[in-house]
Amino acid sequence: MTKQTLTQLEQHDLFLRRHIGPDSNQQQAMLNFVGAESLEDLTAQIVPESIRLSQDLSIGDSCGEAEGIAYIRGLADQNQVFKSYIGMGYYGTQVPNVILRNVFENPGWYTAYTPYQPEIAQGRLEAILNFQQVSMDLTGLDLASASLLDEATAAAEAMALAKRVSKAKKANIFFVADDVFPQTLDVVKTRAECFGFEVVVGPASEAVNYELFGALFQYTNRFGQITDFTELFATLRAKNVIVTVAADIMSLVLLKSPGSMGADVVFGSAQRFGVPMGFGGPHAAFFVARDEHKRSMPGRIIGVSKDARGNRALRMAMQTREQHIRREKANSNICTAQILLANMASFYAVFHGPDGLKTIASRINRFADILAAGLQAKGVSLVNSTWFDTISIKGLDVAAVNARALAAEMNLRFDTDGTVGISLDETTLRTDIDALFDVILGAGHGLDVAALDAQIVSQGSQSIPAALVRQDAILSHPTFNRYQSETEMMRYIKRLESKDLALNYSMISLGSCTMKLNAAVEMLPVSWPEFANMHPFSPLDQAKGYTQLIEELSTWLVNITGYDAVCIQPNSGAQGEYAGLLAIKKYHESRGDAHRNICLIPQSAHGTNPASAQLAGMQVVVTACDKQGNVDLEDLKTKAAEVAENLSCIMITYPSTHGVYEESIREICDIVHQHGGQVYLDGANMNAQVGLTSPGFIGADVSHLNLHKTFAIPHGGGGPGMGPIGVKSHLAPFVAGHVVVKPGRESDHNGAVSAAPYGSAGILPISWMYIKLLGSQGLKKSTQTALLNANYVMKKLSEHYPVLFRGRNDRVAHECIIDLRPLKEASGVTEMDIAKRLNDYGFHAPTMSFPVAGTLMIEPTESESKVELDRFIDAMVSIRAEIAKVESGEWPVDNNPLHNAPHTMADIMDPEFDTRPYSREVAVFPSAAVRTNKFWPTVNRIDDVYGDRNLMCSCAPLSDYE
């Protein structure tokens, strides 16, 4: 028996060995192949010495899964989850267990990527299409997006859309009714300031008194009142005002739709459709508009097209509106959205169906009726005369009521003017109403819930005026009327899941996306009620576990980035960019340099960079790159000097989007600083920095961090994500604040960029666990292994494909770019053909045509083993051999396995397949690996042009189900 010390035996459970794909033998074999003695030797060959850290991170030691779970369990236990009646856009909900287990906790759903490859994403595309159908049915409008980040940012997007499409071109005022949620107004004001819009706040009826391009109303309002806006909206629209409405999704089940009142845009949070509050998120926002505004819609839209066989197929429609194509001219900077949460909400609607939703909404409303009737019977005066779920009260002894509420472990809404609000939800029970009577009235009130209910049944309720009761049918599509049994629902979810390729099947080597392991142990705490069920506006002394977790995570991120402070609020990487640029903007303004509004951006930048700069009110000036893909220093010097007086910042990614560590990065920072600008270092490629270098050490002033890339939050098929920003001390006073929750930061006076003060706090435990489990050495080794895997793949493939960019010592960083343009010229085979052919080999394609058209960018991450890397390499080598057959003329350029990829079961069953110059086996079993573990695309190649020319973004017609 091997003699091992106890210390060595204790290392067996360390998370590090679970997270990193290659074992020690595989690592050594790979090191030998690439020509390095060790990971340290490889690091020295790749990372410029001038920016390498001389000290280790100060995170702590790696630990085992059991130890990590025990620690975070202690944090969770510090949270006191009181019964919440705060409302304000966040409500208790019952997550159906069939959805919790089969979607939220299922890697088949949460590890997929944004469906840029729709042929292997038909399942979640159908689920998202269902979400769009729910959104359109409930709002009464024509076209819905696939989700936005939250209700408040959706409001800001609605304002921007209003300005784009309004015929009142000279108007510069956006009106906001004074009864919207305060966090929504906060985010709208932040965005309006960047655009130079004037925001006027007042009673809804006063909107007609201004020359407006747009207006925003809340339905129902923050106090619970339901208003019929039909006449007001008609008056405003006659004046070319774009009318936008923030709506409660559950109330719309019972209420007249805003679309039928004349609204142009309706948006809101889908949280109460089966998504936990999570101390603020993540939650999907719905966004719906009139068809005439479709080209100005923000975010992703799922549409129906057809595949090569003419069969119905789904895809992301009208992508030319988006940041990755239009850059600074895009409608929005949105990239990551909230697809996983939108899918949960859509499944919630499918599972309950229209009748179930009406029962839930009616029960909520009945409890509100009972509560109101009881209080009014005791002489309590209500602020609102109509309601769906919320009543507001004045004239109470607020201190006494609050004391009784806290003693009963419940939170009410207490406004600064003494108004007390109570919002009921799906989780409300009869006993809760009894307890609320006790809290408001004191003991001995003598009210009986059953008696009050009988009175309401007998006399009727006027809480929803007859004119505002929904008369039209909702969710009549068969999808929402056939899966109400759990057996059927479970099978429907599984049927959709089986159509999608996710990390639980194979590597997803998307460059600049960092599709690493999302370990089960990291995901576990997210479902715990202590984290999942806390309202974001709960008193902070009830959220001590969350507070400590956020403080510890922030401290670790400060250490990892080399910055001085971190702001957790942004809900995505793109929102992080926006928040970071706002901090820069406010910093310049504080120094009397408000005129500094020019943002330098290299040609190779991510599309979100110029889109975010435009969003922050900056002017983009593009700088050139040299033939090696590096920033052209001479061009940068020239342009920095030319715009020096107005230079705000540069946005640069490191390592570069070309996959190399630029030797001149510090000189780039110095050039910008010398001309009075700040350095924004995009954190998209942070997976190649952690433990080896840092943005702060390099010389940057601010960065966002993609927690859904570097720090293990799953991509969810297109969200959630988080984009906290790290800043140097001089920018710390200018990060996002929040109007509702003010934990005493210096930046609290600043506007918000997200609805919740800590963004999507409910998924922060994932990144906390990732860092805690890996520790200082584990984080560093993860980065080094990512470099090893990328260089191994690069060197293997370089024998078959040209590698476009390499850094020092002929190395790449954590990703590499192969150039397909010579092959395309010689054979006619395109990068799209190769991407689709990889589906037949069981792989998602790498990133296509970014940052250079006609290329593939490959990022394997540290979590992939040598076995999986070799399988991918073998597939690419085999595809190269197939291309050679096209080059030689053996296969026609328009009839070969690449041109016809991906192949489906329908292909091999087709009698006409025999006319093809290749066999069925070549088509669907091109490698030995897929013979025993085949992923089958369910549609053939999709016709993108047809889908955009014949736009349809709703569920299939009823005839498809006959």
From Swiss-Prot:
GO terms for cellular component: cytosol; glycine cleavage complex. The modification N6-(pyridoxal phosphate)lysine is found at residue 709. Pfam families: GcvP2_C, GDC-P. Keywords: Oxidoreductase, Pyridoxal phosphate. Disulfide bonds: none annotated. Its EC number is 1.4.4.2. SUPFAM superfamilies: PLP-dependent transferases (SSF53383). It catalyses: N(6)-[(R)-lipoyl]-L-lysyl-[glycine-cleavage complex H protein] + glycine + H(+) = N(6)-[(R)-S(8)-aminomethyldihydrolipoyl]-L-lysyl-[glycine-cleavage complex H protein] + CO2. CDD domains: GDC-P (cd00613). Its cofactor is pyridoxal 5'-phosphate. One of its GO terms (biological process) is glycine decarboxylation via glycine cleavage system. GO terms for molecular function: glycine binding; glycine dehydrogenase (decarboxylating) activity; pyridoxal phosphate binding. HAMAP family: GcvP (MF_00711). NCBIfam families: gcvP, PRK04366.1. The glycine cleavage system catalyzes the degradation of glycine. The P protein binds the alpha-amino group of glycine through its pyridoxal phosphate cofactor; CO(2) is released and the remaining methylamine moiety is then transferred to the lipoamide cofactor of the H protein. Belongs to the GcvP family. The glycine cleavage system is composed of four proteins: P, T, L and H. This is Glycine dehydrogenase (decarboxylating). It comes from Shewanella baltica (strain OS195). The lineage of its organism: Bacteria, Pseudomonadati, Pseudomonadota, Gammaproteobacteria, Alteromonadales.
